[in-house]
């Protein structure tokens, strides 16, 4: 650590560490460190030249110290970079969280403003809210002011209180009657216990008899079950026995026909095997014969070639000898004669060569090597021609005889057309036609069955859809034939007591019998009437305002669904407006938990079901 380079690096590193506080400063430090490194590298040879007598020990120590300083500075820079990234991520997360809080507060502010406007609208708003909530009271509250609506509701409330008091009175009477019946039951049980204690033998006998009776009943049920199974088996076997004879005959005929076919195939197979063996033997004999003939021809050709070569050499020697003799004694006249003789000799040799070529082609065509054999072959061609002419005449006579036989057989076939065999053939053809028609009819039946199945499925889907729609529209009452349960003008409560109720006219799905043939048309008519009534009721409402409200809700739900997965919802302890239909028992979940979209849908569904149940109970009461 005694080198000036180390002191310079240390002095430059200390202010750089003090200056690092932000990501921009980190980059500045990195820029500042680069010249120091290059400067240090440039100073090393100078220091070495100045202190060359000290040896390489001081130089190596200086380099290691500089490297350590640089490595330490790099680690610090990396730590500062990590701190910068963490600070940036935490800042972004705080920004997103604050943005979510702002959006939530805006939504709550909008809801509170809507509630405030709803509260400031007065009596007309109250009347409209009551009409929307209680559709059964709509005809009575439609054209009334707030005070008149309150008076009407007070009157109805007094009626309901009176009915409640009457029901409570009936409940007290029923409870007293129930207590009396329980007392009588306990007395009867005491009497039975005393009888069992006094007559133990009789009780044992009764229990034994009951056990035997139960066993006999179980055995009888099992016997009935076994009897029914055996009867089913008997009916199935009887039905099978009706077609068993025909099936056995058909199967026997099939077996006989298959046996005949098998025998014929065995014969054909044996003939084919014999023909194959004969063909193999003939092929082997022909191959051996051809091989021997080829060997013979090759030997003869080699001998002929040798003889031709020898003759050629002899001719060449004779020509050279004659040429030498003629050269010594030639003259002009003798030269012309020799030229003429040479031309004659060349023509003779050319004709001999052509004859040899033709003879070679004839030998190749006939497969014979000797000249006299070729001559015999050509002479034998005449005998072969005459023999072929004889065979031709014989074949023509045979063909004429076969044609006459064919005409005779054709005439016999024409005569046998109306015999038993011809009738059998016609019956077989007719059977084939009927089978074809049967297949066509079966195909038509299968198509009709498929179409019927599709129609039944469509009808079932339509029925289920209409029943579902009718269930949704069950709270709507339409005009129809009157129905009575019990006495006129009275209805039974859950305990079975009769209470005075106004006679109600209307139709509902529960009063229709699904087993009736006209159930589906009646259900369709009922649903149509309810939909028309619902449409007439919707005409009195502000439909664009309702649609705008629904579109706003869907828009907010879409925005909520597009939030990223890492977005966390923070529940703020804000006291919200409690609904008058809010059920405390169904909202016992912890408010600190994160409410997901699925949980919110489940809560809203439960709230809607609780409201519909309360409305149904209020209508039934």
Swiss-Prot record:
One of its GO terms (biological process) is outer dynein arm assembly. Keywords: Cell projection, Cilium biogenesis/degradation, Coiled coil, Cytoplasm, Cytoskeleton. Its main location: cytoplasm. GO terms for cellular component: axoneme; centriole; ciliary basal body; ciliary rootlet; ciliary tip; cilium; outer dynein arm docking complex. Residues 61-325, 386-470 form a coiled coil. Expressed in trachea multiciliated cells. InterPro entries: ODAD3 (IPR033192). Residues 494-506 have a biased composition (Polar residues). It is found in: Cytoplasm, Cytoskeleton, Cilium basal body; Cytoplasm, Cytoskeleton, Microtubule organizing center, Centrosome, Centriole; Cytoplasm, Cytoskeleton, Cilium axoneme. Residues 484-514 are annotated as: Disordered. Component of the outer dynein arm-docking complex along with ODAD1, ODAD2, ODAD4 and CLXN. Interacts with ODAD1. Interacts with PIERCE1 and PIERCE2; the interactions link the outer dynein arms docking complex (ODA-DC) to the internal microtubule inner proteins (MIP) in cilium axoneme. Component of the outer dynein arm-docking complex (ODA-DC) that mediates outer dynein arms (ODA) binding onto the doublet microtubule. Involved in mediating assembly of both ODAs and their axonemal docking complex onto ciliary microtubules. PANTHER family: COILED-COIL DOMAIN-CONTAINING PROTEIN 151, OUTER DYNEIN ARM-DOCKING COMPLEX SUBUNIT 3. This is Outer dynein arm-docking complex subunit 3. It comes from Bos taurus (Bovine).
């Amino acid at each position: 650590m005694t080198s000036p380079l180390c002191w310079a690096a240390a002095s430059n590193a200390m202010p750089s560490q003090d200056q690092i506080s932000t990501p921009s400063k980190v980059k500045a430090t990195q820029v500042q460190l680069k010249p120091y490194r290059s400067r240090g590298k440039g100073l090393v040879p100078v220091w070495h030249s100045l202190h060359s007598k000290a040896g390489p020990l001081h130089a190596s120590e200086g380099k290691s110290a500089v490297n350590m300083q640089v490595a330490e500075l790099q680690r610090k820079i990396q730590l500062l970079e990590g701190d910068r990234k963490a600070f940036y991520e935490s800042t972004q997360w705080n920004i997103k969280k604050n943005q979510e809080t702002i959006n939530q507060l805006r939504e709550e502010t909008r809801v509170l403003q809507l509630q405030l406007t709803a509260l400031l609208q007065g009596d007309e708003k109250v009347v409209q809210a009551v009409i929307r909530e209680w559709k059964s009271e709509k005809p009575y509250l439609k054209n009334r002011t707030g005070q008149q609506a309150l008076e009407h509701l007070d009157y109805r409330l007094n009626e309901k209180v009176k009915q409640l008091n009457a029901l409570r009175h009936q409940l007290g009477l029923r409870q007293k009657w129930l207590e009396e019946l329980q007392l009588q039951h306990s007395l009867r049980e005491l009497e039975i216990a005393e009888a069992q204690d006094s007559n133990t033998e009789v009780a044992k006998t009764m229990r034994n008899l009951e056990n035997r009776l139960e066993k006999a009943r179980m055995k009888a049920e099992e016997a009935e079950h076994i009897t029914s199974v055996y009867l089913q088996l008997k009916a199935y076997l009887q039905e099978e026995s009706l077609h068993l004879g025909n099936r056995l005959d058909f199967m026997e005929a099939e077996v006989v026909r298959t046996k005949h076919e098998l025998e014929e195939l065995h014969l054909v197979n044996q003939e084919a095997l014999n023909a194959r063996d004969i063909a193999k033997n003939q092929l082997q004999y022909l191959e051996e014969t051809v091989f021997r003939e080829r060997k013979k021809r090759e030997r003869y050709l080699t001998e002929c070639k040798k003889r031709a070569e020898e003759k050629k050499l002899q001719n060449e020697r004779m020509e050279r000898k004659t040429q030498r003799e003629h050269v010594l004694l030639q003259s002009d006249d003798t030269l012309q004669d020799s030229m003429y003789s040479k031309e004659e000799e060349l023509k003779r040799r050319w004709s001999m060569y052509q004859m040899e070529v033709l003879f070679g082609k004839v030998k190749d065509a006939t497969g014979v090597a000797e000249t006299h054999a070729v001559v015999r072959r050509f002479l034998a061609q005449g005998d072969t021609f005459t023999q072929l002419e004889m065979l031709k005449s014989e074949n023509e006579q045979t063909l004429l005889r076969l044609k006459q036989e064919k005409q005779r057989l054709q005439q016999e076939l024409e005569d046998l057309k109306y015999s038993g065999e011809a009738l059998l053939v016609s019956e077989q053809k007719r059977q084939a036609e009927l089978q074809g028609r049967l297949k066509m009819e079966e195909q038509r039946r299968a198509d009709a069955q498929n179409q019927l199945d599709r129609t039944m499925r469509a009808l079932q889907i339509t029925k289920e859809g209409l029943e579902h729609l009718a269930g949704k529209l069950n709270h709507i009452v339409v005009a129809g034939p009157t129905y009575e349960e019990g006495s006129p003008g009275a209805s039974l409560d859950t305990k079975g007591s009769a209470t005075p109720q106004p006679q109600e006219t209307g139709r509902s799905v529960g009063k229709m019998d699904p087993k009736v043939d006209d159930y589906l048309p009646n259900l369709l008519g009922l649903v149509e009437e309810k939909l028309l009534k619902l449409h007439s009721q919707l005409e009195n409402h502000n439909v664009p305002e309702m649609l705008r409200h629904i579109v706003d809700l869907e828009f907010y739900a879409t925005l909520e669904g597009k939030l990223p997965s890492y977005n966390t919802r923070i529940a703020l302890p804000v006291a919200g407006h409690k609904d008058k239909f809010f059920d405390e028992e169904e909202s016992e979940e912890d408010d600190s938990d994160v409410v997901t979209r699925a949980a919110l849908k489940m809560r809203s569904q439960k709230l809607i079901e609780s409201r519909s149940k309360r409305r149904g109970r209020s209508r039934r009461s």
